[in-house]
């Protein structure tokens, strides 16, 4: 059973882990979060004693303090001086003291209203822990859902105003919990535009370690997740805990080590630009957070996260569906194209075995550069040489699927939409606009804007046979000030995200056969919130094969390969001005959902033959990459000059190795494979050589490479 209640103990069990909570005198205390325990008898009791300067909420007990108890929801104002979970203003203060009232076991999953949620299953079970502050007349319900097919717990919080007066939320985390003192590291995934998801590992010291975004989106610079792990853990050893937020807006995540070396973790909506007006009898629900645990190292944590996302996050109709190999015209043409050029690109793509043609920015309004037309989602027939419908038909007649680029959340000042509705943009009254990429952001907190976007895009998707949509978001939000009051303005950032989810939920439900790819200048909104609706993410605008290695490597820790778009582009690369071999560009792009983004027509005969062979090969290994278990064999951040990853699926094994820089007088690299059947025989398809699983895992595979920079090698094995 996923949920068990025994006396004053609440057990939340996954297939391998347990979260155990004690109710004591109305307080909820965390007793264990880790390896599965069926029966708990307080072996790790916190010995209570009088700590100096620790406040005591009970007058006659100097040994009991919220400052030293391990909690699952940090109280505010009664002696817990750590980061609180909640700040809620009522009357003349923001003190809250919630006490436990009752618990309920619920079959299946519980969904947060208006927000993305994991898909539930019949075997899932949920626990509702209901607490109330009788003085302030507030109710707080903590929801936990356990999944028996995974080591993940999903959780969120619901706040209800039971009083007859309004209250204001200033902080509302999705989850928070305290862990015993130990030597911990925190892993985060940071970066910037065109270098997203770079792995960073820090040792936790006393104080506060915090990441977040206040950009209106999850952003390129940080990811709404963190991993807490034992200091000496590695890929295949040690305890690790992942905390992820299913949300696409402003977020915060933190690890805090207090004066007693106890550690608190939390994740949720960022306090910056957030408050929420909770009127009498109204409620507020936080985004859902995920807690994933392993005691088998970071690779196992990765595989648990990948499995959960594929089973419970990615839309079901695409979770187990192979992704098409695409050609995107952006780096081939940018804004400068006509019908003849595009059809020529499609002809070349068809000959090479590509399956999907994507028409990127520049097909609508009078858009010949990035100065105009966002919001005017009607085809420029003069530029496209006819109607959109006729162009799509020509693509389909070539045996290719058709995809189209949109940026629905944005508007250009030079557009019919802006001239008709200048009040629809995010803008503080009497302030000048702040531009980015020459565009403004539509106010998705406005129901009229939401209705307009839904209507326009629904019409386009209904009237045209579009197989794929690339949904872009090319700037962050500034000048927030559309509210009639300051409080209403503080609600705008979260209301924007709720409006976004309203739109994408509607469109992806109605057009459920369309493959949507999320993009924000690459990975500027690469998060689980978007992934609940869009099965694929353009993980970076950087298409350079070498620059992509740490981006894709970092992405792999929590996000499955099938969610990641990766393209072969021209040399010199348009972002890095680097020359890399076509073979290496292909191998790196094959670490994700393979695509091409270059002018195929100008390739030499030999290059076209090489691309055709890449595509033919990828079609053989596509299921291994997109559905297989991933093992990281060499970390580019540690190995400096090389990276190696392995995918295993059914009886197939694929190893991809990339050398970044060559060195003189060095022995060849040997990598030890993982997760094989030690007693089985594996055939290397390229040469016909045979190896035992034990040999490949324990002796290793020596990489046979010539001298030179930016070289790569793939090894494809079949288990006999």
Curated annotation (Swiss-Prot):
Pfam families: Glyco_hydro_36C, Glyco_hydro_36N, Melibiase. Keywords: Glycosidase, Hydrolase, Magnesium, NAD. Its EC number is 3.2.1.22. It comes from the Bacteria. Its cofactor is Mg(2+); NAD(+). Homotetramer. Belongs to the glycosyl hydrolase 36 family. Coiled coil: none annotated. PANTHER family: ALPHA-GALACTOSIDASE C-RELATED, GLYCOSIDASE FAMILY 31. One of its GO terms (biological process) is carbohydrate catabolic process. The active site is at 472 (nucleophile), 541 (proton donor). It comes from Streptococcus mutans serotype c (strain ATCC 700610 / UA159). This is Alpha-galactosidase. GO terms for molecular function: alpha-galactosidase activity. InterPro entries: Aldolase_TIM, Alpga-gal_N_sf, Alpha-glycosidase_related, Glyco_hydro_27/36_CS, Glyco_hydro_36, Glyco_hydro_36_C, Glyco_hydro_36_N, Glyco_hydro_b. It catalyses: Hydrolysis of terminal, non-reducing alpha-D-galactose residues in alpha-D-galactosides, including galactose oligosaccharides, galactomannans and galactolipids.
């Amino acid at each position: 059973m996923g949920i068990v209640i025994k006396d004053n103990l609440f057990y939340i069990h996954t297939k391998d882990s347990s979260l155990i909570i004690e109710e004591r005198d109305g307080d909820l205390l965390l007793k264990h979060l880790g390896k599965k325990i069926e029966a708990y008898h307080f072996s790790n009791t916190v010995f209570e004693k009088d700590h100096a300067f620790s406040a005591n909420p009970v007058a006659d007990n100097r040994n009991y303090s919220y400052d030293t108890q391990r909690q699952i929801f940090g109280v505010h104002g009664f002696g817990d001086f750590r980061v609180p979970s909640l700040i809620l203003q009522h009357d003349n203060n923001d003190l809250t003291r919630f006490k436990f009232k009752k618990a309920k076991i619920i079959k299946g999953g519980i969904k947060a209203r208006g927000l993305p949620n994991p898909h539930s299953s019949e075997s899932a079970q949920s626990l509702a822990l209901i607490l109330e502050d009788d003085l302030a007349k507030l109710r707080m319900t903590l929801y936990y859902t356990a999944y028996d097919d995974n080591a993940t717990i999903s959780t969120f919080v619901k706040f209800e105003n039971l009083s007859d007066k309004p209250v204001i939320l200033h902080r509302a985390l999705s989850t928070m919990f305290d862990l015993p003192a130990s030597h911990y590291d925190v892993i985060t995934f940071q970066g910037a535009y065109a270098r997203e998801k770079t792995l960073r590992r820090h040792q936790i010291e006393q104080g506060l370690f915090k990441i977040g975004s206040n950009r209106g989106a999850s952003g390129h610079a940080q990811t709404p997740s963190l991993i807490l792990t034992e200091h000496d853990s590695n890929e295949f050893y040690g305890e690790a805990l992942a905390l992820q937020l299913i949300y696409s807006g402003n977020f915060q995540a933190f690890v805090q080590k207090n004066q007693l070396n106890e550690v608190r973790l939390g994740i949720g909506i960022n306090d910056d630009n957030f408050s929420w007006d909770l009127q009498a009898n109204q409620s507020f629900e936080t985004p859902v957070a995920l807690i994933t645990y392993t005691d088998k190292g970071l690779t196992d944590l990765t595989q648990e996260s990948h499995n959960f996302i594929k089973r419970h996050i990615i839309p079901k109709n695409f979770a187990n569906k192979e992704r098409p190999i695409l050609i995107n015209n952006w780096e081939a043409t940018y804004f400068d194209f006509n019908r003849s050029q595009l059809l020529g690109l499609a002809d070349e793509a068809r000959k090479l075995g590509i399956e999907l043609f994507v028409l990127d920015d520049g097909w609508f309004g009078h858009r010949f550069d990035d100065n105009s037309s966002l919001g005017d989602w009607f085809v420029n027939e003069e530029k496209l040489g006819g109607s959109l419908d006729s162009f799509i038909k020509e693509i389909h007649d070539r045996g290719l699927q058709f995809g189209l680029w949109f940026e629905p959340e944005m508007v250009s000042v030079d557009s019919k939409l802006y001239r008709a509705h200048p009040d629809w943009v995010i803008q503080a009254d009497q302030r000048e606009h702040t531009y980015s990429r020459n565009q403004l952001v539509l106010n998705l907190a406005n129901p009229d804007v939401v209705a307009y976007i839904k209507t326009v895009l629904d019409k386009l998707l209904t009237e045209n046979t579009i197989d794929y949509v690339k949904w872009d978001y090319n700037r962050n939000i500034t000048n927030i000030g559309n509210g009639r009051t300051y409080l209403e303005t503080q609600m705008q950032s979260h209301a924007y995200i709720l409006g976004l989810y309203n739109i994408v939920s509607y469109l992806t439900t109605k057009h459920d056969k369309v493959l949507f790819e999320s993009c924000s200048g690459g990975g500027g909104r690469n998060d689980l919130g978007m992934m609940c609706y869009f099965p694929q993410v353009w993980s970076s605008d950087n298409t350079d094969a070498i620059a992509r290695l740490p981006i894709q490597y970092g992405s792999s820790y929590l996000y499955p390969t099938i969610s990641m778009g990766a393209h072969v582009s021209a040399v010199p690369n348009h972002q890095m001005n680097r020359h890399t071999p076509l073979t290496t560009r292909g191998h790196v792009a094959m670490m994700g959902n393979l695509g091409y983004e270059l002018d195929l027509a100008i390739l030499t005969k030999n290059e076209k033959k090489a691309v055709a062979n890449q595509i033919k090969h990828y079609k053989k290994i596509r299921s291994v990459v997109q559905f297989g278990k991933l093992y990281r064999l060499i970390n580019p951040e540690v190995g400096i000059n090389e990276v190696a990853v392995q995918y295993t699926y059914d009886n197939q094994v694929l190893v991809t190795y990339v050398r970044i820089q060559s060195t003189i007088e060095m022995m060849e690299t040997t990598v030890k494979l993982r997760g094989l059947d030690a007693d089985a025989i594996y055939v290397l398809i390229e040469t016909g050589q045979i190896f035992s699983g034990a040999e490949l895992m324990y002796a290793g595979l020596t990489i046979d490479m010539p001298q030179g920079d930016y070289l790569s090698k793939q090894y494809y094995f079949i288990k006999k």
